Design a protein with these regions (language model features):
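Polysaccharide-binding surfaces and accessory modules of carbohydrate-active proteins
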Residues: 4, 9-12, 16, 29-194
């Protein structure tokens, strides 16, 4: 269900129907594939090709504005909407979350949050040592359905107060295409209710 390819630093989350894959290059997570189940090939060829001197395929030249960021934040050269914004006591929003490790766990219960009971959960940990913030992304892939859930847990591991500006559980860059969007307006447990 979960596989980590050490040589390419690529995570493969897969069941009989789908594959979700992302890589961690220079400590930064980058989305590679979400769709029909595919072999565990080196998917780094699917990365976006930039038209600038910053090219994600050349070591040391990556710009986060040119990758499909798995965990986009403020102030890292990515001009799209970030999924996470954390302010320190000086008002600084800059974050530099770097991959520190991962582990596979039985499906944990998310205290105080609605949660599913799908199967094992992949926890991927990122830290900003200067700001004192740990972000843990939790991925659960259901064995018998084309469904993936993701959540994020934040921990203040420093000595200073941090203020949360925004925190989304998921961010997903879609390639250019013609899409239809279905929105169920309403509120929790009252979707499609005016």
């Amino acid at each position: 269900m979960f596989h980590f390819e050490e040589t390419t630093k690529t995570f493969y989350l897969e069941n009989n129907e789908i594959t979700y894959a992302f890589t961690v290059e220079n400590g930064i997570p980058e989305h590679l594939w979400f769709g029909a189940r595919i072999p565990r090939d080196d998917l780094r060829y699917t990365r976006r090709v930039s038209c600038t001197s910053c090219d994600a395929q050349l070591p040391g030249t990556m710009s986060e504005n040119h990758i499909a960021a798995e965990l986009p934040t403020y102030g890292r050269g990515d001009f799209r909407e970030p999924m996470l914004g954390v302010r320190d006591e000086t008002g600084n929003l800059l974050l530099h979350l770097v991959y520190t490790g991962h582990r596979i766990l039985p499906q944990p219960r998310l205290d105080g949050m609605p949660s599913t009971f799908g199967g094992e959960t992949l926890e991927v940990t990122f830290e900003d040592g200067e700001k004192g913030l740990r972000a843990v992304l939790l991925y659960t892939l259901f064995a018998d359905a084309a469904a993936l859930t993701r959540a994020m847990r934040l921990e203040n591991i420093g000595a200073h107060t941090l203020m949360l500006d925004r925190a989304f559980g998921f961010s997903f860059d879609l390639p250019v295409g013609a899409y239809e969007t279905l929105t169920l307006a309403g509120s929790w447990a009252a979707e499609r209710t005016p």
